[in-house]
Amino acid sequence: GAGVVVLMSASMAIEMGVPVYGVVAMSGTATDKEGRSVPAPGKGVLTSARERASGGSPHLQVLDVEYRRRQLRKRQTQIDEWAREERALLSTDSTQTSESLEFINTEAARQHRDALDSWGTEFWKQNPHISPLRGSLSVWNLTVDDIGVASFHGTSTKANDPNESRILNLQLSHLNRTRGNVIPAVCQKHLTGHPKGPASMWMLNGVLQTLRSGVIPGNKNADNIDQELKECEHVVFPSRALRTPGVKAGLLKSFGFGQVGAECLVVHADCLLGVLSEQQLSEYRGKLEKRERRAYRYWHNTLTGVHPFVQVKTSPPYASSSSESTYLDPHFRLPKMY
């Protein structure tokens, strides 16, 4: 089998008015060594918590979103000032002025994008004091204490369960998660079994449902937790569902065969929608409602035989006679369908 998830940038999702179920704040894979045991899990995913354990990492100034916002505004002001100075130096030659003005505007836009990356999603990169996990959380003004659920690979094997629990516990300890703020572990393979292709897709869907509902499902078969797992002070294995005021972020783990592991940090969609202005949010909601109505009609037309579910296109969205000029035109864009 297989599972499909539609991923796109936040700006594109807002512009198109598509439903946002969650934000992929971080993802990664890791292989730690050569292993002869097929089912033995590796520990390479520990690298997402790699940072110098100085005890002061959570207090770094750059982790403060207000500090980063101030630096971003300062950089944006510098870019705008540079663009104004360059425009003032343009000659009166209309041809040269037009081309130079286009370059200045394009370069200013590029610098603005770089500034957003530098002080936004990528501020923590190449900093040995900030781990990928901590940095990715801080992008959304969250900390390691805000991770409210962990979706385990959870194969219930003698090798996987203790190893996976210890790895998560070690990550949280290294990142100074507050003691007593335990993270519920969800091992949904007790219900779904172990699929092949869509395993992580099902787990991701479960995390998204937890983020949207605030309900952390229990592990129905967890009626006798192994004493060995008690050493993991940051992890708890609930046997019944927990209704919470809300879960801000969830951590999904996948431990594959041959020491291959993967990890994905998913943040609540409200963290994205919360940064929009009132006008932007209103426009997004309008587009979303329109898209939902169209999707509803399309689906029912499929069920009633009006048209097939997949309508395969047999011709390009441009005239065949102009294909060469289209390929060579960097400004060519298809008409918006939303």
Residue ranges of model-derived segments:
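Active-site-adjacent elements of ketosynthase-type condensing enzymes
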Residues: 28-48, 124-131, 155-170, 198-202, ...
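Conserved small-residue
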Residues: 6, 24, 147, 152-153, ...
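Condensing-enzyme catalytic core mediating Claisen C-C bond formation in acyl metabolism
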Residues: 1-136, 140, 149, 267-328, ...
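Active-site-proximal alpha-helical scaffold in enzymes
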Residues: 1-18, 194-219, 230-239, 264-267
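Short glycine-aspartate micro-motif
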Residues: 21, 149, 219, 250-252
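Solvent-exposed alpha-helices and their adjacent loops that cap or buttress functional pockets
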Residues: 14-16, 143, 177, 239-246, ...
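A short beta-alpha structural unit
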Residues: 117-122, 148-158, 187-195
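Conserved catalytic cysteine-centered active-site region
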Residues: 1, 15, 106-109, 167-202
